[in-house]
A protein has these predicted regions:
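N-terminal intrinsically disordered/low-complexity leader segments
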Residues: 1-17, 192-199, 228-234
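Hydrophobic alpha-helical bundle segments that form small-molecule/ligand-binding pockets
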Residues: 126-148, 154, 158-177, 201, ...
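C-terminal all-alpha effector/ligand-binding and dimerization domain
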Residues: 201-202, 206-230
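Short, basic, alpha-helical segments at the C-terminal edge of helix-turn-helix-like DNA-binding modules
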Residues: 70-75
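Hydrophobic alpha-helical connector segments
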Residues: 77-125, 141, 148
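Short glycine/proline-rich, acidic loop/turn segments that cap or connect secondary-structure elements
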Residues: 179-195
Length: 234
C-alpha cells in the first residue's frame, strides 16, 4: 500500500528542545555530579539530543551556568527593606548569603570580579540596594562599591568553606579525622589553642554569619560618618 513504508519511518522534525527542558536537565546533572562535571555533551546525552541542538540555546558551559543562576535569582523573593541604611545593608547581604548558601555551586561560579556584568537585573537588585544604602549613609559611590565587595568576599568565603567542609552543618557528625583536631599542642607555645582543644570543632560548626555580618557592616560604615539632614545641628 502506498504510504506503508513512510508509516514505519521517521516523519517530520524531532520534538523541539525548550530552554526549560535544558535548564531542568542541567540542574539534575549538577545535583548528581557537581557543576564541574557538567558538559554540553553530557547534557545533550541526558536530554537525548545532539550537542549542536543545545548551541541554539546556549553559547557554552559558562553561558549555561549563568542562565541557571538567572533563573534561580528570578525565583528568589526579595525581602522587605528597612528604612535605616545600615539595617538595609544587613538585610540585603543576608538575603544574598542565604540564597547562595542553598545553592553553593553558584557562589563558586561567581568567584570572579567580572561576575557583576553577567548578572540579570533581578539578581542585581540587592546589589543596587546595598550601594544605595551605603550612599545614603554617607559613603561616596566608590566607598559604596568597597562596602559591597567586602561583604561579598566575606559572604562567599563563608559559604564555600562550609560547602567544602564535611560535618559543618549542625545535623552532620564531625568527620573522625577532625576529632583529635588540636590534641598534642604545646601549651607553653600555644596556650589558647591548647586550652580549646577539640572544642574548636564544635565551635567552628556554629552559624555565626549573622553576628559577623552585623559587626562587619558596622565596621565598614564607621569609616564614613552618617550624613546629617539639612538644618540639623551636630
Amino acid at each position: 500500500m502506498p504510504g506503508t513504508k513512510a508509516a514505519h519511518g521517521r516523519v517530520g522534525r524531532p520534538p523541539a528542545t525548550s530552554r526549560t527542558q535544558i535548564l531542568t536537565a542541567a540542574r539534575r546533572l549538577i545535583d548528581q555530579s557537581g557543576w564541574e562535571k557538567l558538559t554540553i555533551r553530557r547534557l545533550a546525552a541526558e536530554i537525548g539530543v545532539a550537542p549542536t541542538t543545545l548551541y541554539h540555546h546556549v553559547r557554552d558551559k559558562e553561558d549555561l551556568l549563568f542562565l541557571l543562576i538567572h533563573e534561580y535569582a528570578d525565583r528568589i523573593p526579595h525581602p522587605d527593606l528597612p528604612a535605616e541604611p545600615r539595617d538595609r545593608i544587613v538585610v540585603c547581604a543576608l538575603a544574598i548569603h542565604d540564597s547562595l548558601a542553598a545553592w553553593p555551586w553558584a557562589a563558586e561560579v561567581l568567584t570572579t570580579d567580572g561576575f557583576i556584568a553577567r548578572l540579570s537585573d533581578s539578581a542585581l537588585k540587592l546589589v543596587e540596594a546595598i550601594l544605595a544604602a551605603a550612599v545614603e549613609h554617607g559613603c561616596t559611590p566608590e566607598q559604596a562599591v568597597h562596602v559591597f565587595r567586602s561583604l561579598w568576599y566575606y559572604s562567599v568565603g563563608e559559604i564555600l568553606v562550609r560547602a567544602h567542609s564535611p560535618g559543618r552543618r549542625p545535623d552532620d557528625e564531625p568527620p573522625a579525622r577532625t576529632t583529635p583536631f588540636l590534641d598534642g599542642l604545646d601549651a607553653s607555645e600555644l596556650p589558647h589553642l591548647a586550652a580549646l582543644g577539640d572544642r574548636w570543632v564544635s565551635l567552628s560548626r556554629l552559624d555565626t554569619y549573622p553576628q559577623g555580618l552585623c559587626a562587619f557592616v558596622d565596621g565598614l560604615l564607621a569609616q564614613t560618618p552618617p550624613t546629617t539632614a539639612p538644618g540639623v545641628d551636630g
